[in-house]
């Protein structure tokens, strides 16, 4: 029944948007407000679903066209269903729905001189995604022919793992993410670095279980993410490799610590990303880099320390040594970013003029980044 409610509500929203855009008395802000209310009303009362809803509501503020809002909502529906899918076909359809929405948004939001680069990166992502998804779909059909069932329970799950790792941008399947990070608009970059990762890890925790070790992908992601950032001329490319390194740490949490620690560090990562790509204050940007580097007293330090502590508890010493080495290695280019932005001239007054929503978001995320260690330090002292 909820599927019919979603489809009917989305059709009404499309109709309202198409009619309102022709009316000079109805602005895009009204449509955005209705989209946000609709998201809250349709979301089930579960923690991960509500977190994805709140994140999408925040991300809607960065998009300034009705078409972009519509595709963002379609991607949200795909993510919401994928998080609770227990069937191979439903997982495939929902996952590809959000992929197609991202590709279309790359074309819609491309502006200026970076248009060709954005379209090229989107096409690379689409073709690589189609290749991986096609191979997975062939495997799904082979499983159905052999077992007569499409349920995930009792099936061999290697191709599901491979598709998920590709969508997360895990090394060595990461080149599409570097191209996209360097060419797409900032609003879409903020979406791509947060919402899909939350939905994929939630699906991993709630609907899907595997017997494969991801230790090889952890090592690839951490080493490529920490080494590949050196020599990058663009800041976006640097943070693309930083994201690959962070994904390696999140996989290390899955491998050694469990999903509670995963959600803890993923929440810190999302808050930091919301700050990074919404800032015009350069010194606050530098503080976000401090948290990403894992330096105390910010939340990023305690998130990484909690993962390392669990890795030591389960005696995964090889992964722990690699993670510590890559963290120290990545600290060098984070310090370059900190030096660059902390010593730059600050224009605080211009940073917050005429953007009340952005100011509220920045303030809330900055408070969370600073005071989250108060909660994260409890396991170490109790």
UniProtKB/Swiss-Prot annotation:
Where the protein is mainly located, per its record?
mitochondrion
UniProt organism field: Chlamydomonas reinhardtii
Q: What does this protein do?
A: Core subunit of the mitochondrial membrane respiratory chain NADH dehydrogenase (Complex I) that is believed to belong to the minimal assembly required for catalysis. Complex I functions in the transfer of electrons from NADH to the respiratory chain. The immediate electron acceptor for the enzyme is believed to be ubiquinone.
The record's subcellular locations are: Mitochondrion inner membrane
Provide the GO MF annotations for this entry. Answer: NADH dehydrogenase (ubiquinone) activity
GO cellular component, alphabetical, reads: mitochondrial inner membrane
Known Pfam families for this protein?
Proton_antipo_M
Q: Which residues cross the membrane?
A: 1-21, 33-53, 54-74, 88-108, 123-143, 158-178, 188-208, 212-232, 239-259, 260-280, 284-304, 305-325
Q: What class of enzyme is it?
A: translocase
Q: What does the record give as EC number?
A: 7.1.1.2
Listed under catalytic activity are: a ubiquinone + NADH + 5 H(+)(in) = a ubiquinol + NAD(+) + 4 H(+)(out)
Keywords from UniProt, A to Z, are:
Electron transport, Membrane, Mitochondrion, Mitochondrion inner membrane, NAD, Respiratory chain, Translocase, Transmembrane, Transmembrane helix, Transport, Ubiquinone
Q: Does the UniProt entry include the keyword Ribosomal protein?
A: no
Per its UniProt entry, which superkingdom is the organism in?
A: Eukaryota
Task: Give the membrane topology, semicolon-separated if more than one.
Answer: Multi-pass membrane protein
Q: Which family does it belong to?
A: Belongs to the complex I subunit 2 family.
- Protein name per the record: NADH-ubiquinone oxidoreductase chain 2
Among InterPro entries, the record links this protein to: ND/Mrp_TM
